């Protein structure tokens, strides 16, 4: 039967083999598909147009049905960006309405960015403007970065009232009320939420950014799948941003946006000026101080060490660096343009192992007389009045914000972005006040599309492996790395402690049942030291034979005597016959019944060889 700990190790080994076997199976499947054994052919499902209840009246909803064209609902911008070169000022990015490159649902179309490295702008008028009042505001859409994303956005601009009058003039300066959606450049991304809020006192409109999570990774852009972005803003100012139905971040307009929506009650008076006699210096130079007479400012900081001597192995005849003898002038070297060619310098091999080469110079050391430039010490300024600041006055533009009061009505939805990637597909754009409608649209569109994309990836072998999924999860939630490390280290530590943490138990010491010599006796260490031998000798003197001619031995236990007497005679005869030869050799060491027992020291002197077993027997008798 296997030891329990080795059984545990064996089971772990089997688990590793099984994982590798699964990997081999996947590889075999890939090889089989390459060798001609085809997987089940993927057949796209048919698109079913989403439907809302008759009572539902969203402000805007477009799922881009077959037959939709640019210029009908969606108007491409003809404007130019301000303050940029004319070559890149135009919004000349191309748009189309069509199917994605990899079709998972037949007949499911979307609005597609067809070009990269260009400015794109397009907008559509809402069926009914959204006015911020007692109802929630909900914006929802899905977007797919088919080519990934190097640098660019995928966000919506919810345009303020008035923009719908001229959608062809839509550009980056067009006023918007809310900007919402993903944006990425480089190795980091974010999901924007920006409010433009109007101060009711002075009429100024300012941008306020929702606080972002520390990191959301790049999976939304790099996995080439469709993702659903949902924004909910309540009249209380509470907002939540979700991706694929899962909360990404949330907060409140009154406390979690930057800068604060609530202006300060007091501000500095810009007309207040600092008095001319206001002294802000905490310390000043002591004008009464003078330089000490022994202060020499001309002493250098370092001086030559006069006590230094040249090392005995210093070679002044060799240079520390020499031209590389193996270097060759490049073939394209032009002496007229590049000057005279010189071989690069390398360390002189003749100086290897020496203290140095070339002209020897004594090293420098810190000058003990150096004191530097003298400056007057600082003292407290008797005229110090503290740090001056303008006086505070009541803020004339202060107001107590109510979240929805400063948000302008929304009349159009636009997409205005610069991107370095093409084939960005927007779909199922919804503006409403009903969370139920948003949930229903997501069920009828995104979740079906998500499952079909997974099915397509599985059928074509383009799905991400388990390792990539783990990495993608850590991009979204970096703290998962700590969980992964613990999940790996803790079992390894447990296995190590379980298998190797305990020492082996020492073998039990079994007492011999007879003094018969055995081959291992010579390898047993002498257990009697010099002091114990003296004690043994004294005990043996006390145990010399008495008048009766016998040694004063301790009484024999009655049970042992009976055990000896009960041994079969045949056993004794066989034992005596088998040991007759040994008795002849050990005759000198046997104490006969009628002979007095000699002291151990005398026996040792007469015996030509005292074995380890004999020493132990002597020690036991002495005890």
From Swiss-Prot:
PTM note: Glycosylation is important for its biological activity.
Per-repeat ranges for Sequence: 269-281, 286-298, 305-317, 324-336, 339-349, 358-368, 372-382, 386-396
Major subcellular location class: endoplasmic reticulum
Bilayer-spanning residue ranges: 480-500
Binding-site residues, Ca(2+): 108, 427
Membrane topology, from the record: Single-pass type I membrane protein
Source superkingdom: Eukaryota
Region ranges (Disordered): 260-337, 536-623
Protein name: Calnexin
Organism encoding this protein: Caenorhabditis briggsae
Lineage: Eukaryota, Metazoa, Ecdysozoa, Nematoda, Chromadorea
Gene: cnx-1
């Amino acid at each position: 039967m296997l030891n329990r700990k080795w059984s545990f190790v064996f089971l772990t080994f089997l688990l590793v083999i099984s994982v590798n076997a699964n990997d081999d199976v996947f590889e075999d499947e890939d090889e089989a598909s390459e060798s001609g054994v085809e997987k089940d052919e993927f057949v796209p499902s048919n698109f079913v147009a989403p439907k809302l209840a008759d009572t539902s009246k969203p402000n805007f909803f477009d799922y881009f049905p077959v037959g939709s064209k640019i210029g009908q609902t969606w108007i491409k911008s003809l404007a130019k960006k301000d303050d940029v070169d004319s070559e890149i000022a135009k919004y000349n990015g191309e748009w189309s309405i069509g199917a994605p490159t990899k079709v998972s649902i037949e007949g499911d179309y979307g609005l597609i960015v067809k070009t990269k490295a260009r400015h794109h702008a397009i907008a559509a008028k809402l069926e009914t403007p959204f006015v911020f009042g007692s109802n929630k505001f909900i914006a929802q859409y899905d977007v797919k970065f088919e080519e990934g994303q190097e640098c660019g956005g995928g966000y919506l601009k919810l345009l303020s009232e008035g923009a719908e009058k001229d959608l062809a003039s839509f550009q980056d300066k067009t006023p918007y009320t809310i900007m919402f959606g993903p944006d990425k450049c480089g190795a980091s991304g974010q999901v924007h939420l920006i409010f433009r809020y109007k101060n009711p006192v002075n009429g100024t409109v300012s941008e306020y950014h929702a606080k972002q999570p520390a990191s959301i990774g790049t999976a939304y852009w790099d996995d080439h799948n469709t993702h659903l972005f949902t924004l909910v803003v309540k009249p209380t100012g509470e907002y939540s941003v979700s991706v694929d139905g899962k909360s990404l971040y949330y907060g409140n307009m009154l406390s979690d946006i930057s800068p604060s929506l609530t202006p300060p009650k007091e501000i500095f008076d810009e007309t207040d000026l600092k008095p001319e006699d206001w002294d802000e210096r905490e310390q000043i130079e002591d004008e009464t101080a003078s330089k000490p007479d022994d202060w020499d400012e001309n002493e250098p900081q370092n001086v030559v060490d006069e006590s230094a001597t040249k090392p005995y192995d210093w070679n002044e005849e060799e240079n520390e660096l020499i031209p590389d003898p193996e270097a060759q002038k490049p073939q394209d070297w032009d002496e007229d343009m590049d000057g005279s060619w010189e071989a690069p310098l390398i360390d002189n091999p003749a100086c290897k192992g020496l203290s140095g080469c070339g002209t020897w110079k004594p090293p420098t050391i810190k000058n003990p007389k150096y004191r530097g430039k003298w400056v007057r010490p600082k003292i407290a300024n008797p005229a110090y009045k503290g740090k001056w600041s303008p006086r505070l006055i009541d803020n004339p533009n202060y107001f107590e914000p109510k979240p929805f009061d400063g948000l302008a009505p929304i009349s159009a939805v636009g997409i205005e972005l610069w991107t370095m990637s093409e084939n960005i597909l927007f779909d199922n754009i919804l503006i409403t006040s009903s969370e139920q409608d948003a949930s229903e649209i997501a069920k009828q569109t995104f979740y079906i599309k998500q499952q079909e994309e997974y099915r397509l990836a599985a059928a074509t072998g383009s799905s991400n492996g388990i390792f990539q999924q783990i990495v993608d999860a850590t991009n979204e939630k970096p703290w998962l790395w700590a969980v992964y490390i613990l999940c790996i280290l803790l079992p390894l530590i447990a296995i190590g402690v379980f298998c190797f943490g305990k020492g082996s138990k020492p073998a039990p010491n079994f007492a011999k049942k007879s003094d018969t010599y055995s081959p291992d006796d010579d390898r047993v260490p002498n257990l009697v030291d010099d002091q114990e031998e003296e004690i043994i000798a004294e005990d043996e003197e006390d145990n010399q034979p008495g008048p009766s001619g016998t040694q004063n031995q301790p009484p024999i236990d009655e049970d042992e005597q009976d055990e000896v007497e009960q041994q079969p005679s045949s056993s004794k005869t066989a034992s005596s016959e088998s040991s007759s030869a040994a008795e002849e050799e050990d005759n000198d060491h046997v104490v006969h019944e009628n002979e007095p027992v000699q002291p151990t020291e005398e026996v040792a002197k007469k015996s030509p060889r005292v074995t380890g077993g004999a020493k132990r027997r002597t020690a036991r008798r002495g005890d």
